[in-house]
Amino acid sequence: MENRSVERVRENLKEIRFRVEEACVKCGRDPSQVTLMAVTKTVPAELVNAAVAEGVTLLGENRAQELLEKFDSYFLPPEQIHFIGHLQTNKVRQVIDKVGMIESVDSVRLAAEIERCAAARGRTMEVLVE
């Protein structure tokens, strides 16, 4: 991993945090109440972990295959990883143990499959419905 890439992650996070803080101040909101989610779309696990090392505590993955490929490399537990993209019903059982929330439930059929797979593992899955 190039040092320039890691430095760019640091600089980007610094800028994003500054912008979030500015926006919060403008609307009278406490910046500590805002959670930054780093979306990992096509970003190598090494750079994602550089963001985690800089204090990012929540990841968003939008592709099941990428999540499966990178999951074991992440420095965060499943509870701090959200699935944010369209999830195909046939991929639910592959990602159910790797995320703490599925933010993209767009059908009753998908919700039922999530419930079935989660129950089979003795857990519940938090979801957001589109």
Language-model features: locations:
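Conserved alpha/beta-domain cores
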Residues: 1-130
